[in-house]
Structure formats: structure tokens, C-alpha cells
Curated annotation (Swiss-Prot):
Tissue specificity: Expressed by the venom gland.
Segment forming the signal sequence: 1-21
Annotated Gene Ontology cellular component terms: extracellular region
UniProt cross-references to InterPro entries, sorted A to Z: Spider_toxin_CSTX_knottin (IPR019553)
A GO term for molecular function: toxin activity
Organism this protein belongs to: Lycosa singoriensis (Wolf spider)
Positions of the propeptide removed during maturation: 22-25
Protein name (Swiss-Prot/TrEMBL): U6-lycotoxin-Ls1d
Origin superkingdom: Eukaryota
Subcellular location: Secreted
Keywords assigned: Disulfide bond, Secreted, Signal, Toxin
Posttranslational mods: Contains 4 disulfide bonds.
Record family assignment: Belongs to the neurotoxin 19 (CSTX) family. 06 (U6-Lctx) subfamily.
Amino acid sequence: MKLLLFTALVLVVISLIEVEAENERACIPLEKECTKTPGNCCSGLKCDCYRRFEQGVAKGIQCWCIEKDVTYKGV
């Protein structure tokens, strides 16, 4: 019985350590691509996505970490 309780306690501790490690993963810095992980930009940044066109044909969506209060306009 004690072995069973000890094993359960060890498993709980290991799972808590894994969750904490996942929460501390490295964030994506300014102007780096965040298409696959949009919620992982560093503090003060947001993941902003754009649809890319080549000769009028959509070629997919690309996302970049940019500053939260900055707006970009085409030239």
C-alpha cells in the first residue's frame, strides 16, 4: 500500500514539473515568425497575420510577432 501511494506521489510530482517546464518555454522575439505558434510571442508583442498574394493568387498566411500598439500600412 505504501509503495502504491509513493508511486502515485512521484507521478504527480513529475507531471507538475512537466507542466511548469511547458509554461516556461522560450517566447518568440520581435519580427520573428509566429505562424505555427501564435500565442507564444514575448511580452508586449502580438502575433499579427497577413494573407500573402503573388500575382493576385493567395499563397498562404504568414504571421509575425509585432509590437501591440503599432499599425503597419502598405506603401
